[in-house]
């Protein structure tokens, strides 16, 4: 199957098509999981002929269990119908690659990044290194600021936890100073 030919039906840029194909093949190889195929020989499907098509398809697995699946009453993915049909007709690693290609093509058309590794993340640096020297408690034994608070025991919501401060330099632990309320 010529994947490049399939991509070219949806994407005009040669460079973008090459990048997308490489990304899809890499991800399909990494995250490929075997799809468990229903091996039951007899699957009876009953289609309801209702006055109002509510979009539910009824399928009967065996005589004891019933399962319901949503069946869209409005055809979706008309723009990508050929690619969706290819996904249905293939299996294995090709199917996974085509699924990634479909996702990537939709992202390219929507002008969003398809590679999660390139999506900019939030800057969490403000949440780390919160225990600076100015905000840490001074050790009662060696007067060092290299201390860290530790919760030893948590209680119910109406009681405060047992907290001790441990000095990393001398190894002593002590109770934190109490705040006085007027």
Swiss-Prot record:
Q: List the disulfide bonds.
A: none
What GO terms are given for molecular function?
DNA binding; DNA-directed RNA polymerase activity; zinc ion binding
Ranges that cross the membrane: none
Which stretches does the record call TFIIS-type zinc fingers?
A: 135-175
Gene that specifies this protein: RPO30
A Pfam family in this protein? Zn_ribbon_TFIIS
Instruction: List this protein's GO terms for biological process.
Output: DNA-templated transcription
Q: Per its UniProt entry, what is the enzyme's top EC class, as one word?
A: transferase
The UniProt entry's sequence similarity note says:
Belongs to the poxviridae DNA-directed RNA polymerase 30 kDa subunit family.
User: What EC identifiers does the entry list?
Assistant: 2.7.7.6
State the protein's purpose.
Answer: DNA-dependent RNA polymerase catalyzes the transcription of DNA into RNA using the four ribonucleoside triphosphates as substrates. Rpo30 may have a role in RNA chain elongation.
Please list the residues that bind Zn(2+): 139, 142, 167, 170
Please give the catalytic activity noted in the UniProt record: RNA(n) + a ribonucleoside 5'-triphosphate = RNA(n+1) + diphosphate
Give GO cellular component annotations, separated by semicolons: DNA-directed RNA polymerase complex
Keyword field: DNA-directed RNA polymerase, Metal-binding, Nucleotidyltransferase, Transcription, Transferase, Zinc, Zinc-finger
User: What is the name attached to this protein's record?
Assistant: DNA-directed RNA polymerase 30 kDa polypeptide
- Assembly: This enzyme consists of at least eight subunits.
């Amino acid at each position: 199957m010529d994947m490049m030919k399939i991509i070219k039906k949806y994407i005009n840029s040669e460079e973008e098509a090459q990048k997308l194909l490489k990304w899809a093949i890499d991800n399909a190889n990494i995250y490929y999981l075997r799809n468990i195929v229903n091996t039951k020989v007899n699957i009876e499907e009953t289609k309801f002929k209702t006055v109002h098509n509510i979009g539910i398809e009824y399928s009967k697995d065996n005589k004891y269990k019933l399962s319901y699946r949503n069946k869209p009453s409005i055809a979706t993915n008309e723009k990508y119908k050929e690619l969706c049909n290819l996904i249905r007709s293939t299996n294995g690693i090709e199917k996974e690659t085509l699924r990634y290609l479909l996702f990537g093509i939709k992202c390219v058309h929507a002008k969003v990044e398809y590679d999660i590794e390139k999506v900019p993340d939030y800057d969490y640096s403000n949440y780390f290194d919160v225990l600076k020297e100015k905000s840490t408690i001074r050790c009662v034994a060696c007067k060092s600021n290299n201390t860290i608070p530790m919760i030893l025991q948590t209680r119910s919501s109406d009681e405060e936890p047992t907290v001790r401060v441990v000095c990393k330099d001398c190894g002593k632990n002590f109770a934190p100073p109490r705040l006085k309320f007027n």
